[in-house]
Amino acid sequence: NPFSFGTFARGYNLNQQEEIGEYYATLGRREGYAAQMAYLGLKAGLINPKTLSADNTEYDLSGDNLERLQTYKIERSGYVNKYNFNFASQIGDFIYLGMNLNAHNINEKALYSVKEDNFRSSNPYLRYANHKQYINTTGEGFSLQLGSIIKVTDELRLGVSYQSPTWYKMKEESRQVLYATTGVATRTYDRDIELVNRYGDPIWYEREYKFRTPSAWTASAAYLIK
């Protein structure tokens, strides 16, 4: 059940007056990602406080945890570019050298969506829920390859090559939206929870990180049959 926010909600205090987006950021720094998800569920009506007292930290699920329709969707678009700069040299008639310098460029946009509807109960309080997470990733990287072939005899060739790691520097921007519909009898209420600042602008959360891929050595041999 991807909307079992009751698991995450223990310990969240109902008494807060900040903007949704700003409080979401503060909650993440203090309590972590699980608490942020519980907060979105609370604002959308997926979980409800057991009491309305300021010090309440106990919540109940709005969903019935019975049969429902779940839809998962992932959309990705973007590109990965690689630019090569090649160099070659020869020493005498028996040593051949080569080098590639590579520049990498990444730009990807992704949408992760989880939707639930068609709840089994005849008159459920929670009618519809759709959590969306947008992630934009950009980055640059560098790598190189070195290689050499040695002509041992007219028939025998020995080779060795080195593939360096690809060193990446990445930047990731993300934002979340939670849409929900709740209702009693024939009356329904739409709750669209978007993370915005006090001026109404969407809030994107940024993080930067570095990583590298493994390196590799390769050896080879060839014998020419005349």
Give the label of every model feature segment.
Residues 1-226:
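Outer-membrane beta-barrel porins/channels
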